[in-house]
Amino acid sequence: MSSKRIVKNIFENTDNDKVAISSESNSKISFKDLKTFIEDISKQLSGTGLSNKDRAAIVLPNGPAMATSFLGISSYMSAAPLNPSYKSEEYEFYLKDLNPKIIIVEKNSNNPSIEVAKKLNIEICELKTHKDQPDGLFD
């Protein structure tokens, strides 16, 4: 069973208007908007030259962006969330072990995973959020 199908199963019997994800700032994402977002992320990834057999490492703090990025990315390819508190040595171990094609980080992050990814020639993708979007949605 493909990961796209597994992620889709999560939402099969949900009310589209109900809240899927909320944040401390009282920002809310409905199941309908989350489904659309996941489909959009999957389409964006497929248009980048990344294969659904590739892996992505995600280095984000717990919260809506981590949840939505994991769901969106794992609907297309393997996604491996990594603890943003890891030290360089830990990132080097996990990134060598995972061998991801891409690493997802917050825009303007100074997380040590970025330097390790550069050293290992892993593409770095920074999440771009917009103030007019609910927490967890990004480009």
Model-derived regions: residue spans:
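Short beta->alpha linker loops
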Residues: 33, 61-62, 86, 107-109, ...
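AMP-dependent adenylate-forming
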Residues: 7-30
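Internal alpha/beta domain cores that form substrate/cofactor-binding pockets in large enzymes
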Residues: 57, 79-82, 94-98, 111-130
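Conserved ATP-dependent adenylate/AMP-binding module captured primarily in the ANL superfamily
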Residues: 51, 86-115, 134-137
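Adenylate-forming
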Residues: 10-13, 34, 38, 45, ...
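Conserved AMP-binding/adenylate-forming
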Residues: 42-86, 98
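Conserved AMP-binding A3 loop
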Residues: 30-32, 139
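Flexible, low-complexity linker/hinge segments
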Residues: 1, 129-139
